[in-house]
From Swiss-Prot:
UniProt keyword annotations, A-Z: Cytoplasm, GTP-binding, Hydrolase, Magnesium, Metal-binding, Nucleotide-binding
GO cellular component, one term: cytoplasm
Protein name: GTPase Obg
UniProt KW Transmembrane helix keyword: no
Originating gene: obg
Native organism: Aeromonas salmonicida (strain A449)
GO molecular function terms listed in the Swiss-Prot or TrEMBL record: GTP binding; GTPase activity; magnesium ion binding
SUPFAM superfamilies in the record: Obg GTP-binding protein N-terminal domain (SSF82051), P-loop containing nucleoside triphosphate hydrolases (SSF52540)
PANTHER family xrefs: DEVELOPMENTALLY REGULATED GTP-BINDING PROTEIN-RELATED, MITOCHONDRIAL RIBOSOME-ASSOCIATED GTPASE 2
Enzyme class: hydrolase
Compartments (UniProt record): Cytoplasm
Cofactors that this protein relies on: Mg(2+)
Known EC number: 3.6.5.-
Function comment: An essential GTPase which binds GTP, GDP and possibly (p)ppGpp with moderate affinity, with high nucleotide exchange rates and a fairly low GTP hydrolysis rate. Plays a role in control of the cell cycle, stress response, ribosome biogenesis and in those bacteria that undergo differentiation, in morphogenesis control.
Length: 400
């Protein structure tokens, strides 16, 4: 199946149902009061994370998704049925943002997590809601509000513990084949890897970690050269980065300059990503003499001002790969996952369009009715108030 990690879709929440104007009319009850019911709320649109999915390709061809409209209110104080919600299933690791405003709606980082992305319209109010002491037969109602319409940008960010960086043909795919059961394509030309690959590295005592191999970077990737930096986003969730350096490039380029190029492109993309723990791993050590290798490694470390751990491996023969993996396992044990907490802290409360639409509507109607009642009372004199009935014959008794 084709790997698709970024799509744009439109989601339409359901409109709210309209309120109803109706009066109770039954035999022997000629003056029944209002009985118009409220409409139903419009359906919402949700994203839900599904661990059985690994690509967003389904949304490449189906881009419009709408929830159901709420039904209108009916007589006899019958409330309209609420519209059905629309549930969109996406892979774990999907990030949703509003394409128009740039607002980050949320990250779906574990199976079954649910995210509201478009809120349905609020229901309209029936005329029963507007009944008051001075308005016994209200003929006003309110219409339901439209549901939210959003253009969403969905990005799939792979959930890996370790990410690999390097120029094309540095040996990243060969390394991941050597340490895991993943089988990415390996060939002797640049950009053999066109999409990210994941591999599971298993150690002793049931310990394991997930490693991500992304397409190689070249100079100018931040400006769109090569495959650009679109795949660097898959490293944002990684806890450790492996910078794989080809110590003996086939094009006779300088390994030190190549290493500096990768770090610069990383810093251009994200200073936060560049600040993650990064290990320097020299590959293809079997193709160079030991004295030359020492000199090249010193030049690379000096160019990068690097003081962290350094590893020497040959991915094709698996020499030195086990030590790298075991040391990574030890490091990860000291770096507990904080993905879910960090994601919740980073995302601000999402404001939806109709959250407070009718918050004061009923209060305002009650205030207007109270004001009308007070104005009516002030227009009456005290002598106008008596307990006599206005209809029928009034009899006055006079004492002799």
């Amino acid at each position: 199946m084709k790997f698709v990690d970024e799509v744009q879709i439109r989601v339409d929440a359901g409109d709210g149902g309209n309120g109803c104007v109706s009066f109770r009319r039954e035999k022997y009850i000629p003056n029944g009061g209002p009985d118009g019911g409220d409409g139903g709320d419009g359906g919402d649109v949700y994203l839900i994370a599904d661990e059985n999915l690994n690509t967003l390709i389904d949304y490449r061809f189906e881009r419009f998704h709408a929830a159901e409209r709420g039904e209108n209110g009916q007589s006899a104080n019958c409330t309209g049925r609420r519209g059905k919600d629309r549930i969109l299933r996406v892979p774990v690791g999907t990030r949703a943002s509003d394409e128009d405003t740039g607002e980050l709606l949320g990250d779906l980082t574990h199976h079954g997590q649910k995210l509201l992305v478009a809120k349905g319209g609020f229901h309209g109010l029936g005329n029963t809601r507007f009944k008051s002491s001075v308005n016994r037969a209200p003929r006003q109602k309110s219409s339901g509000t439209p549901g939210e319409v959003r253009t969403l940008k969905l990005e799939l960010l792979l959930l890996a513990d370790v990410g690999m960086l390097g120029l094309p043909n540095a040996g990243k795919s060969t390394f991941i084949r050597a340490v895991s059961a993943a089988r990415p394509k390996v060939a002797d030309y640049p950009f053999t890897t066109l999409v990210p690959n994941l591999g599971v590295v298993r150690g002793e005592n049931s310990r394991s970690f997930v490693i991500a191999d992304i397409p190689g970077l070249i100079e100018g990737a931040a400006e769109g050269a090569g495959l650009g930096i679109r795949f660097l986003k898959h490293l944002e969730r990684c806890r450790v980065l492996i910078h794989l350096v080809d110590i003996c490039p086939v094009d006779d380029s300088d390994p030190a300059e190549n290493a500096v190029t990768i770090v610069k492109e990383l810093e251009k993309y994200s200073p936060e990503l560049a600040g993650k723990p990064r290990w320097l791993v020299f590959n293809k050590m079997d193709l160079i003499l030991e004295e030359e290798a020492v000199e090249v490694m010193e030049r690379v470390k000096t160019a990068l001002a690097y003081e962290g751990p350094v590893y020497q491996i040959s991915a094709i023969s698996k020499e030195g790969t086990k030590k790298v993996c075991y040391d990574i396992l030890d490091l990860l044990d000291t770096m507990p996952r904080q993905l879910a907490e960090d994601a919740r802290d980073a995302i601000e409360k999402v404001e939806f369009k109709w959250d407070d639409y009718h918050k004061n509507q009923l209060a305002q109607a009650e205030a207007e009715a109270l004001a009308a009642s007070m104005a009516f009372d002030e227009g009456l004199d005290e002598e106008d108030w008596d307990d006599d009935e206005d209809d029928g014959v009034e009899v006055i008794y006079v004492r002799d």
